[in-house]
Regions:
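OB-fold and OB-like single-stranded nucleic-acid-recognition modules
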Residues: 1-148
């Protein structure tokens, strides 16, 4: 049991205090086998029509600025077959726009929220100064992107 549980890829995810930026946050989730694990959950994965889910997501204290350190080798130095640690059931439906028209699209498991679902996840708080997002073109005007 211990080898099966601990002999997995590891991701250490830097988390910054949530100051309203869009992005995924650290949450405990329960998979289809009823097992709890730490995951990075994106807003598109949350049923915002469900008042309690929306409240939990909206009140999250931290989010992931995509600062990750990963270990992809086993304790004996062999590379993991990373496809063995994907949760292929973690796809979700999201709204996108194509040529100014709203459409719904199925997203397959993303890197944080499916492809790394069965990794060992460790979340650590990092200073906000390490986060300089580019989610929109206006973010390029922020202090962290100005060199003059």
């Amino acid at each position: 049991y211990l080898i099966k549980t601990l002999n997995k890829p590891i991701r250490v995810c830097g988390m910054v205090k949530n100051e309203g930026q869009p992005g995924g946050g650290p949450f405990w989730i329960r998979n289809t086998n009823n097992e709890l694990s730490l995951q990075i959950v994106e807003s598109a994965q949350v049923d915002m029509e469900n008042v309690s889910q929306k409240e939990v997501f909206s009140n999250s204290t931290h989010f992931n600025p995509v600062d990750l350190v990963c270990s992809v080798k086993s304790f004996d130095g062999k590379k993991f077959e990373l496809k063995d640690f994907v949760d292929y059931n973690m796809g979700f439906i999201t709204e996108k726009s194509q040529q100014a028209q709203k459409i719904k699209a199925q997203e397959l498991p993303g890197l944080w929220n499916g492809s790394m679902a069965n990794w060992i996840s460790i979340f650590v708080e990092v200073p906000l100064e390490t986060f300089t997002p580019v989610k929109t073109i206006n973010n390029l005007l922020d202090k962290g992107h100005n060199t003059f």
